[in-house]
């Protein structure tokens, strides 16, 4: 199993190109199931999760062709996928595939919308009553789908097609909003989604669906209106840049020191995180090519942050910020309001010598003068990259194990950091 070795102490200087957003690319690929024509997606990141979703879509009979780089593309230019769901041969998504990635459950929406039936395995590890899929099922039922759960599978049927409805989510849900928008695009009549998620990735998917002939307004606000259409057609769409990758590398620069241009980044996608970084002592400069992040000489200042849905501070940057705050001059406080059990990285950060205490959903980080390299283990995607950030400023060698988590969400992370001067390498085997 691959590992990443890091010897800390080097500043970061150079340019890091920002990849396409995983959290937009996955639902965009799934949306291709809504039409029998070809959807062309540009700037799709090369990630393990994208490759897995290609397998899942292939199971339904979807043909996917990955085009090579075009003249003038930079080294990390995202791939172009030509996705054709001309014929759907199977409306069942089996457990062995869905269990590996929760987002793959979303195929239920376009399948029941277009084929009027779907059988999709519950994602792995879902306890009855606290399942994240409950809100997704509620949305489909509001649109007229008949839902049964049998043998670990959700079976959705809509013999006469889906019908527009008002869907009021009891809490903001990104996955629920994606599912509701995709399903409603082909429903008969008007659908109104209240308390919709406002994330940029929701807007990106809605923009693509509108290019395909959907009639969606209000994406990016808490109320989305969808006028259903009978058929969607093919289109070409460029995946927006990854705001979580942008924030991650910005925090890496703030941790290690130096100055890095984040090429292609869009500051409006993560303003709350950039404001926190400025408060922590980083210098953020917006320019025509993206964002320049610098920390030259100044120490790291402590911050108090609460995660929140967009446009608040994203939960997907919480672990990275915690790593940065381990070196702050004073006590920082981070409260997690979006997900339970999202402090699994605390135990591993402690192996560097970090001082972190937990009280419910709030972590208090007492900054230390130095971190020391250590063997550490990645527990999930965002936690894994927080360990890399800590290692960049730690004395000595750090070995990060179980980096398959990293490969799910960060495209060639070690190459991008190495190009800016980090002493980092992937060790195979």
Swiss-Prot record:
The modification 2-(S-cysteinyl)pyruvic acid O-phosphothioketal is found at residue 126. GO terms for biological process: cell division; cell wall organization; peptidoglycan biosynthetic process; regulation of cell shape; UDP-N-acetylgalactosamine biosynthetic process. It catalyses: phosphoenolpyruvate + UDP-N-acetyl-alpha-D-glucosamine = UDP-N-acetyl-3-O-(1-carboxyvinyl)-alpha-D-glucosamine + phosphate. InterPro entries: Enolpyruvate_Tfrase_dom, Enolpyruvate_Tfrase_sf, MurA_subfamily, RNA3'P_cycl/enolpyr_Trfase_a/b, UDP_GlcNAc_COvinyl_MurA. The keyword rRNA-binding does not apply. One of its GO terms (molecular function) is UDP-N-acetylglucosamine 1-carboxyvinyltransferase activity. Coiled coil: none annotated. Its EC number is 2.5.1.7. SUPFAM superfamilies: EPT/RTPC-like. Phosphoenolpyruvate binds at residues 22-23. Keywords: Cell cycle, Cell division, Cell shape, Cell wall biogenesis/degradation, Cytoplasm, Peptidoglycan synthesis, Pyruvate, Transferase. Gene3D superfamilies: Enolpyruvate transferase domain. Belongs to the EPSP synthase family. MurA subfamily. Cell wall formation. Adds enolpyruvyl to UDP-N-acetylglucosamine. This is UDP-N-acetylglucosamine 1-carboxyvinyltransferase. The gene is murA.
